[in-house]
Amino acid sequence: MAAPQGGYPPQEGYGQPAAYGSPTQQQAPTPVQHGGKKKRAYAGEAFEFGSGANAALGGQLPAGGSYGAYPQQQAGYQQPAAYGADPAQAYAAPAAPGVAQMTQQFGAMGMTDPHLLPPQPAPQAPQAPRTVPLNQLYPTDLLSQPFNVAELDYPPPPIVLPPGTSVYPSPYANCPPKYVRSTLNAVPTTHSLLKKSKLPFALVIQPYAALHDSEDPIPVIPDQVISRCRRCRSYINPFVTFLDHGHRWRCNMCNLTNDVPQAFDWDTALQKPADRSLRPDLNHSVVEFVAPQEYMVRPPQPLVYLFLIDVSYASVTNGLLATSARCIKESLDRIPNADRRTRLGFIAVDSSLHYFSIPRDGSENSNPQMLVVSDLDEPFLPIPGDLLVTLSECRENIESFLDKLQEMFQNTQNNGCAMGSALRAGYKLIAPVGGKMTVLSSSLPNVGHGALTMREDKKVLGTSKESSLLQTANSFYKSFAVECSKAQVSVDMFLFSSQYQDVASLSNLPRYTGGQTYFYPGWNAARGEDAIKFAREFSDYLSSEIGLEAVLRVRATTGLRMNTFYGNFFNRSSDLCAFPAFPRDQAYVVEVAIDETITRPVVCLQTAVLHTTCNGERRIRVLTLALPTTQNLADVYASADQQAIATYFSHKAVERALGSGLEPAREALQSKIVELLATYRKELAGGSVSGGGLQFPANLRGLPVLFLAMIKNLGLRKSAQIPTDMRSAALCLLSTLPLPLLMQYIYPKMYSLHDMPDVAGLPDEKTGEIVLPPPVNLSSERVVPYGLYLIDDGQTQFLWVGRDAVPQLVLDVFGLPDKSQLRVGKQNLPDLDNDFNQRVRAVVEKSRDHRSKGVGSIVVPHLYVVKEDGEPGLRLWAQTMFVEDRADQSVSLVQWMGSLREKV
């Protein structure tokens, strides 16, 4: 890989080859104004330098020598004299030196992107000679060159390997960052150097980048010839070396020489010799092997879904029972069933357990039978034979059962919910085969096993005692989860209560079984937006090609050891993570220890996931990452990945919050960022305080902002207003979201819509992907009173309508003559016959597009319309997204940087 270009930030982030991906989201290039017909811009000074919110378009000069030396803001934001006075220019043309001219000037300087500006700070001299220079360190001052949100879209610092590291020169030889990211892309050779750096060494692993294989295909090796090292059991990969005329290979992890299997160079399909240099496992770092018999303890299990549906009064009245029954029925074709072995079962739960035996299609009696069990202490299985039925054999009867299920309980007055007992009963039913228990509930489990009580106390919120509410109230939920894990049973929770439901306790079941907690506070099917959101998400959930009976292990070069694992699974032994089901919408963090001095120029870390596909095939997904080593602290800092580091500390903060409390978690985050800044200043900035600044390398400039945003996140922030269930659900997200979604959840995306560039909201000519406007920093200083903004944290979207928004804007976007008629709250945007409405809708939809971020997710965020001068509660909620502002018991970004400067 070529050495990175000088100057920060160089083109494409850090001079990284295209194979490793520049920012996934297509950012809008700046429009060049021509004399022809002009697109509408709804702003007063749409592109005026320093005004408006379009930071990345020029209001804010990002990273570069003079980052963020903002020109003075205009005094107030004058509204244009007359909107649409000139019919040719429907909404006031942009004034002043349009960014267009600047773009042309920068273009002449070879800098087509306005956020890649001159002059560069001088790179630091490396301390030790290398065959290939690693990334250079670019010092910057965080105070005089403020953070620009566009920096969060840069790819990680490139992984610079010596030439000839891989056995064949394949562009796919090293693992792409969407699957595995290391916090350090240059690894210290000793434990003492790592300790001196104060940086963490960890991997962020996301083995799947989509819910379905077809959306993210990787090479599959079907010949069942799997070559592994005899000693360390690593899989053959692009970084091994061949010896003895290719008859033996040396392991790149432990150096042992192994024999090449006889069938390695034989094409079983064509029955003739094959070209070894074309084998996927020697060219691709991400591959999947079809596993032979010896990788199975038992025949591959079928896909099993057991639905535990709350049918108590709360669940019938809010429409959950009817909506989930209808949604399962409509999704039967989407549930993976290629091998025709998929099985389904249903248990309805109130103060009793209701089992359903569903006959095969074409039987004499096609009516489902309901069997009620009221003994909750030892729930027995009535007739286990046909309680779990094969989908393809009972399809019609399953449909008619789901139609009837809604009616069976429509007049119930039963407020009991024996979900703990139902889980025990469900476990007995599916433990022999393993599978998924999907819980759909609107109530607190209040009778039977694992009964819980209302323990939330408003007086405790915001105090040190609040932490006890985030811990499990009943040991059943942890001990039962471990039992489930051993029997290959996974639990997913869909929770819908409008009252306290104890998410803190219930979320333990998914946490230890490879499941997930999905939380829908105050959900009601009578609101169309609620019903549609859940139906879309639940249908995608059922269609997801999950893995079954899976284990994950990470192996590495001698001298490295996997130390701690974070994520939703059960840690079965020191280095083995067990997943009864392997989801496709989660990421995992593994901390790596350096136990002995590393003498090699390159280390490798290999993740392997052994699993059964939902089509009954045993497979191993292998992801191999090679990283250069260094004895030089400057190299370690210059190659550190700020987003991977933030992900690691997000998991650490959740662990600390659940173990010690929220205040210790927040304090730990603050003291960590202070420690990193102080270490950098002392070791690499020569201890000098140049003009009272705050020095940090260019590639880590976002870290102080991300740490502040974490401290302000719903899961961790200091507040007496946050319901415990909301907080617990947020902690679940902070410890499971894939990296791109976690970054957005911590530091949401904000787009200025009223003055978006001409190309935004339209398909890109080359890729066909909708172009998003440039993101804007999350500060109210960036928001103009006549503006329209989209704020999106990946879970919720807000459409912010400024108090002085002009009538034409309201008419074009919402189809209403006057802002006073605009209803606030949850809604879908109307589909109107005008260009601007279509572009706004396209941006809202594209912002939800998980696939373009390289992740699998079922979440469809709600869209809330917020008026700046409208309903105060909603406005305050939206304003919590402005993480750079001062808020309830928390500091602004400027104050935060000032306090960091004092502490350093």
UniProtKB/Swiss-Prot annotation:
InterPro entries: ADF-H/Gelsolin-like_dom_sf, Gelsolin-like_dom, Gelsolin-like_dom_sf, Sec23/24_helical_dom, Sec23/24_helical_dom_sf, Sec23/24_trunk_dom, Sec23_24_beta_S, SEC23_SEC24_subfamily
Keyword match Metal-binding: yes
Gene Ontology terms: biological process: COPII-coated vesicle cargo loading; intracellular protein transport
Keywords (A to Z) from UniProt: Cytoplasm, Cytoplasmic vesicle, Endoplasmic reticulum, ER-Golgi transport, Golgi apparatus, Membrane, Metal-binding, Protein transport, Transport, Zinc
Compositional bias (Low complexity): 1-18
Any single Pfam family the record assigns to this protein: Sec23_BS
Residues binding Zn(2+): C229, C232, C251, C254
Membrane topology: Peripheral membrane protein
Family listed: Belongs to the SEC23/SEC24 family. SEC24 subfamily.
Protein name, as recorded: Protein transport protein sec24
Lineage: Eukaryota, Fungi, Dikarya, Ascomycota, Pezizomycotina
